[in-house]
Amino acid sequence: MSGLPRSVPDVLDPLGPGAPVLVAGGRVTGQAVAAVLTRFGATPTVCDDDPVMLRPHAERGLPTVSSSDAVQQITGYALVVASPGFSPATPLLAAAAAAGVPIWGDVELAWRLDAAGCYGPPRSWLVVTGTNGKTTTTSMLHAMLIAGGRRAVLCGNIGSAVLDVLDEPAELLAVELSSFQLHWAPSLRPEAGAVLNIAEDHLDWHATMAEYTAAKARVLTGGVAVAGLDDSRAAALLDGSPAQVRVGFRLGEPAAGELGVRDAHLVDRAFSDDLTLLPVASIPVPGPVGVLDALAAAALARSVGVPAGAIADAVTSFRVGRHRAEVVAVADGITYVDDSKATNPHAARASVLAYPRVVWIAGGLLKGASLHAEVAAMASRLVGAVLIGRDRAAVAEALSRHAPDVPVVQVVAGEDTGMPATVEVPVACVLDVAKDDKAGETVGAAVMTAAVAAARRMAQPGDTVLLAPAGASFDQFTGYADRGEAFATAVRAVIR
């Protein structure tokens, strides 16, 4: 379809034919937003402070503007559509809010266009969020829907953007959404939504933990609300949900209205009186986190009528994504696991607790999160720790307090060489990769090579050398995938 209806439904207000819309951000999301707005007859102007990002838009004949100029002109726009990376504190968005100009994200735009019938009959949105496990759960959900014979598309923060899939013939959308996306999607009301867990994360973007939690809670405002009962924050959100149907899931035996585990099988007592879904042993994701992900996905799939057999088939054949508890190698009785996607302390704790004896490679950008509770919970599993990245001193401090007997090595590189150790970790326990890094090797690769070598020296047969960093990767790597690949390369080198 093309063109907005002349009589604009309330769900699209203030977006109408010819409406002046400021697109904040000229990168991939901004390109998709500008294309959709143009297609439906609005008048977009693209804002970015990088001229390189604006050039393709200008070549397509779209007006472009810098952030500072856009702030001065903000009252001339009916709407701002922001890319997820723009926080509310960004001067441009703060100016829009002060001027009373509505701010949507790309997900909000997609939701409203879909709800208005601009792409045909609206789809049913099944939305997954949480601090950890979103991608695995959403992928499992999509596999369950397909196994059940449903026309479903995987999208959101995984795969394709929602705006990019609305032309596809689908009845259901399996959507992974981050807190950034949800913050700018205030009207989202999914068919069913799940909050897996809530832990400190992205506090450099959200002003407070309360704001982060409130963003996550938006997925529980539709018809069916699903949340993890073993997580106190997620359970509290479920208690406050306005959804007509509220479903919890837990690792223990489920009560009526819940999914859980009984006799080593997943059981549904929410959408059936007492339905056995599948054996825990068939879940390919290791540890309790894999069981929780499968329970959440099953709850959403059951909410739209997917039968137990299809759920079991999907889980049995499911393959975990790269850099998510991925076994890289087993050598000399030591298992090397890449969980580079564990980018916050909550995820790292879940990862460590999946194994009995762990040499933990950790560190990076903590984004304001504390590790103390997590390190205390995992201390009994740790037989060694190798710390990397900008915020490694915070990890060292938590280990010193909660796991003082665990040997610790810090790997230092580049601009960090002037501060090689903390009080808790003496200079003798620091590896300076700047002294002998290989020609042409990136800092990240050199750091990981040293880290894996140190971890190998600590490990004994039966141990797991686990990359579960608890932090973001951008201080030394281009992303979590780059960090995971560096780990795999280093492992292959050390076991040769």
Swiss-Prot record:
Pathway: Cell wall biogenesis; peptidoglycan biosynthesis
Pfam families: Mur_ligase_C, Mur_ligase_M
MF terms (GO), sorted A to Z: ATP binding; UDP-N-acetylmuramoylalanine-D-glutamate ligase activity
Enzyme class, broadest EC rank: ligase
Gene Ontology cellular component list: cytoplasm
EC number(s) recorded for this UniProt protein: 6.3.2.9
Keyword Cell cycle recorded: yes
Reaction(s) the record says it catalyses: UDP-N-acetyl-alpha-D-muramoyl-L-alanine + D-glutamate + ATP = UDP-N-acetyl-alpha-D-muramoyl-L-alanyl-D-glutamate + ADP + phosphate + H(+)
NCBIfam families cross-referenced by the UniProt entry: murD
PANTHER family: UDP-N-ACETYLMURAMOYLALANINE--D-GLUTAMATE LIGASE
Annotated function: Cell wall formation. Catalyzes the addition of glutamate to the nucleotide precursor UDP-N-acetylmuramoyl-L-alanine (UMA).
Family note: Belongs to the MurCDEF family.
Name the record gives this protein: UDP-N-acetylmuramoylalanine--D-glutamate ligase
Annotated organism of origin: Mycobacterium bovis (strain ATCC BAA-935 / AF2122/97)
Name of encoding gene: murD
